[in-house]
Swiss-Prot record:
Toxic segment of the protein is located in the N-terminus. InterPro entries: Pest_crys, Pest_crys_dom_I, Pest_crys_N_sf. This is Pesticidal crystal protein Cry11Aa. Pfam families: Endotoxin_N. Belongs to the delta endotoxin family. GO terms for molecular function: toxin activity. It comes from Bacillus thuringiensis subsp. israelensis. GO terms for biological process: sporulation resulting in formation of a cellular spore; symbiont-mediated killing of host cell. Promotes colloidosmotic lysis by binding to the midgut epithelial cells of mosquitos. Keywords: Sporulation, Toxin, Virulence.
Amino acid sequence: MEDSSLDTLSIVNETDFPLYNNYTEPTIAPALIAVAPIAQYLATAIGKWAAKAAFSKVLSLIFPGSQPATMEKVRTEVETLINQKLSQDRVNILNAEYRGIIEVSDVFDAYIKQPGFTPATAKGYFLNLSGAIIQRLPQFEVQTYEGVSIALFTQMCTLHLTLLKDGILAGSAWGFTQADVDSFIKLFNQKVLDYRTRLMRMYTEEFGRLCKVSLKDGLTFRNMCNLYVFPFAEAWSLMRYEGLKLQSSLSLWDYVGVSIPVNYNEWGGLVYKLLMGEVNQRLTTVKFNYSFTNEPADIPARENIRGVHPIYDPSSGLTGWIGNGRTNNFNFADNNGNEIMEVRTQTFYQNPNNEPIAPRDIINQILTAPAPADLFFKNADINVKFTQWFQSTLYGWNIKLGTQTVLSSRTGTIPPNYLAYDGYYIRAISACPRGVSLAYNHDLTTLTYNRIEYDSPTTENIIVGFAPDNTKDFYSKKSHYLSETNDSYVIPALQFAEVSDRSFLEDTPDQATDGSIKFARTFISNEAKYSIRLNTGFNTATRYKLIIRVRVPYRLPAGIRVQSQNSGNNRMLGSFTANANPEWVDFVTDAFTFNDLGITTSSTNALFSISSDSLNSGEEWYLSQLFLVKESAFTTQINPLLK
């Protein structure tokens, strides 16, 4: 249902940055009014930075009228979303910190706006302000209240990094020597790393705590971070450049059904991969394994959802994705416990006494919901009703996807639970097993083709994943179509055309994507390929650069190669030395035209290939995103510090 009382802010379409919705249901309401203007400005600024003016703009958005109104709104919105409230004493402390930051910010901002100001004085005010923000930041890392404080911490970091970039670009105009500028470049790079590390510490702490209570609570918190936090963490690293596009492809999640706890290792090891499904395919069909049991007269008949089997296009028959999700054509079997290629579910049934129920005692159905004509579900109505006769046992489900009624409960009316988000569509539907251990102790060396199978006695939940509309084009066309009107494109690593067998899904939300690809030990090349096509009217003589974001914890002697592949017309775009670096780094290719690559028409299908030769034991590397940008629009304004 819409809440017309919310003054939602429309996001400029060209930013492609879904950061708000106007529904009071489901969990992620109310609308993201507080952060939307900041996100919109950052998306514009990263495309074209307003030198020496960006800090002033961000300051006015975070502290409009020299008041902490935006930060207060962030706090109250987040408190509502995740049901966590700061004490009044803590709120008073934060308000005092806001006043201190506002005071020194206003002094600096007002001074540099004066005509004919003295650069040496501006330098002093700048250093005072930078030091004040650094000194006060720990107040926004509140132990046991990480859920609320992480959103406040994020905006204070954004303010500081914007200040540093303006100072770097201002240079002598603000009284800085080249040595000063060099020190600010070093500080900026250090703080991007430091702030992201501290942010992820808060996220991991709170997410792990909430998941131990309930996976639903954990997903609600993750939704908040996917909108209020992680896109800004991605913006920090993009502030090094001018001309790139800030785009979030993070999904939102809705959980319906019996609450189950999971630990953080279970999330990273299996649950996240089950939720994600086939990462580079669209959802086409959903099968719900449903049972109806007749019980003694004093216990109502029950409907149970025993399992959810999503089918993607093209179908692999998998319920989830670990590794690259393939079930055959393995190059070799791994004997080191690293290769987990497939997750399948087998189902059996139990009565309230946890005794097996024979199939003849069950009215069991597989209910299938096909995809609608437009290829994408936009909403769902999924509900469950609990019996009072037997604690925590479900006795009614109602499932409707789009306009398709999948299951109409036999237990009477169930109130609607409308699941939808402006700018999002349903890309994945799954369920998390309840009553089974997800902390596997299998000897992986004995598993045929390294396949894990498990039993799921009582699922009784449904988890719906909503992807932002900026991903629809890829999932419908299976290629990345380029238009001459856009200066920059973002290609998430998971939107691949092909990937080598030795690849794994890694949860990296601070990259503003649903995950990265991890390449692990293999005797052959590690490779991911991305399909590229040109829209009609594309100028194939325009010069572009390709930027790949990777993380290489251990040195790769063979380095990383970037190539274009087009019907045997292969061209090396770049070959990079991959020294050990635990942080994300960007490799930038030399400029090229699509004429150079032999891609001259919209009918030509080409591939960008990112690869490395065989990895030894202990070696691995990660691929997060690709950025394609016009050479004329792209500038590296702050050189990264490479280890």
